[in-house]
Structures are given as C-alpha cells and as structure tokens.
C-alpha cells in the first residue's frame, strides 16, 4: 500500500510539474516577431548590406543597386543596361535567368574609403568561350565602387574579379536555361577578407576543376587577389 501510494504521489507530482513546465513554455522566452514595410515597389530585391550608421545598400536583380540612407532617402546609384533613373550605369551588366545584379557588401573601412562591392553578370570580359565553350564562359564579375559622401552617386568602378563562370546555354536540367545556378553572394569575414559564393552552372565537374572559379567559395582581398 505504501509503495502504491508513493508511486501515485510521484506520478501526480510529475504530471503537475509537466503541466507547469508546458505553461511556462507558452509564456516565457517566446519571442514576439513583428514586421513592417520599409520599401515598396521593388523588383526582385536580392541582397542588402548595411553601414555602421544604418545606411542600407540593396540590389534589384534586373535593375541595379541603390541605397536607403539612415534619414530615409532612397538614391538609385548604378543600373544595368536598359534601366533608367540611376545616377550612372554599366551597359555591360545584364539580367538573365538566375543571373543579374546580385550580391553586395560594404567595406569594413567604409567610413574612410567609401567602398562597396557588387557581383553581377557582365558581357565585358566574356571572350569567345561564351559562344563555343560551355565550361569556359567568364560572365560574372565582382566590382568595387566608391560612394560619394552625399550618398547620391558612385565612381571609380573597378572590376576586381572578372573570370567567374556563367552558364550561357540551355541544358536538359530542370530550370536549366542560361544564367542558372549562378551564385554570387558577397560577405566580409572578421579578418577583412571578402567571401564570394559562385554557382556550379549545372555542371558537376566545375567545382572540381583546378582553375575554374564556378561552384566555389572564394576568399579574396579588396583588390580581388
């Protein structure tokens, strides 16, 4: 009888503890998430990068990159071919499939050097490979810009990486059109290097190639080396 009573008491205590724990789980430590719109009317927004002051640079895949300043002004800085309204543009930049103007990153020393970095599809450095060689088509680049102090324009475009592979032809993969599996995310690491992800272009052997840059994670300095 003693053993049964002891077991029953233990069971009741355990059940009560479990109910109390579940009640706490519902009310304690549960984050409340809210959302608000800060920009409207964007077309395929792809990436964002912030200055330490809170200015937000962002890309639109088939248009260009802009900045929303801490004070709320939105300035369209650099567009691709066929766009309008940007302070300046590059006619070699284009949008196709999953490719376009994609990754963007702010230099850790932005306050001093005013530099940002942008990855995009480009015709500038393509060469003949994009016409007759599926493997060797250098159609993605990483650019470096300097932003004006009033945040209204960029200058001194420098293409610091020019030989990232691009998919120029249709293939038999699902969604296998030109520009597929393109990659191009940019981020700075804690040691000051710029990290870039590149796409495999639906070619499983590309990441294993000893010299081609597709299907890899690249670590480069701010000059592209």
What positions do the PLM features span?
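Short, contiguous, pocket-lining structural segments
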Residues: 178, 208-213
């Amino acid at each position: 009888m003693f053993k049964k009573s002891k077991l029953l008491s233990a069971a009741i205590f355990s059940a009560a503890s479990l109910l109390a724990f579940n009640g706490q789980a519902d009310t304690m430590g549960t984050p409340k998430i809210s959302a608000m719109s800060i920009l409207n009317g964007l077309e395929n927004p792809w990436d964002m990068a912030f200055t330490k002051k809170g200015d937000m640079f962002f890309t639109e895949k088939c248009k260009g990159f802009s900045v929303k300043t801490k004070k709320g002004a939105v300035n369209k800085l650099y567009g691709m071919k066929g766009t309008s309204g940007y302070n300046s543009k590059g006619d070699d930049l284009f949008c196709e499939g999953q490719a376009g103007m994609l990754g963007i990153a702010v230099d850790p020393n932005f306050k001093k050097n005013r530099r940002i970095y942008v990855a995009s599809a480009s015709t500038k450095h393509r060469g003949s490979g994009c016409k007759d060689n599926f493997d060797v088509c250098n159609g993605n680049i990483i650019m470096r810009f300097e932003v004006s102090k009033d945040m209204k324009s960029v200058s001194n475009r420098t293409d610091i990486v020019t030989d990232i592979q691009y998919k120029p032809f249709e293939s038999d993969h699902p969604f296998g059109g030109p520009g597929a599996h393109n990659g191009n995310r940019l981020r700075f690491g804690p040691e000051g290097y710029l990290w870039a992800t590149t796409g495999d272009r639906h070619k499983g052997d590309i990441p294993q190639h000893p010299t081609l840059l597709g299907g890899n994670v690249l670590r480069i300095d701010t000059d592209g080396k």
